[in-house]
């Protein structure tokens, strides 16, 4: 997908953009259905477990976060009663048929847990160990559903215009990443 200023301005304004029919002609429900079908396809894999988040409290996220990790504890460690899970975060944009992925870790304990957020610098990085097959499977399924998988080369670039983006994830001057993947509490 070619990233134009028109597309960036639309997604910053909260409007759908892109050539995929769900985004070009569809309503919010069609876009949600498209993302749901994509996640369902990912969930069918025997190689990964998927946990999804599409909101964070009372805020708004311009993307759905899918955390993918190996089943049966194969990407987990337990230290001092806390479970640490290595995986791949996949962000599916709700405003354009674009997605990103990169290394993510989560922790869980009896008192709660923690996780982070991807930034433009984290893209196309993967956890240590054997993840190539899983990465390839995720990529294939995302591309089958019409998502363009963007990387740091495209998304680390600054916006070519001044924009106001309500986000807790970045500060001005904003990057192309911030236009597609923003969250505000």
For each predicted feature, which ranges?
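Extended, charge-biased low-complexity segments
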Residues: 2-144, 149
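Acidic, proline/glycine-rich low-complexity IDRs
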Residues: 137-185
């Amino acid at each position: 997908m070619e990233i134009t200023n028109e597309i960036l301005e639309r997604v910053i304004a909260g409007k759908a953009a892109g050539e995929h029919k769900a985004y070009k002609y569809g309503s919010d429900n069609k876009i949600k259905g498209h993302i749901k079908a994509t996640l369902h396809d990912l969930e069918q894999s025997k190689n990964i477990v998927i946990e999804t988040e599409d909101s964070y409290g009372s805020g708004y996220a311009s993307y759905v976060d899918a955390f993918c990790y190996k089943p049966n504890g194969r990407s987990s460690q337990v230290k001092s009663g806390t479970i640490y899970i290595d995986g791949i975060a996949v962000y599916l944009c709700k405003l354009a048929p674009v997605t990103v992925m990169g290394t993510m870790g989560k922790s869980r304990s009896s008192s709660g847990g923690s996780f982070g957020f991807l930034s433009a610098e984290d893209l196309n990085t993967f956890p240590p160990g054997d993840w190539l097959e899983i990465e390839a499977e995720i990529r294939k399924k995302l591309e089958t559903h019409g998502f363009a998988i963007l990387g740091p080369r495209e998304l680390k670039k600054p916006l070519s215009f001044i924009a106001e983006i309500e986000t807790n994830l970045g500060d001005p001057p904003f990057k192309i990443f911030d236009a597609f993947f923003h969250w505000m509490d």
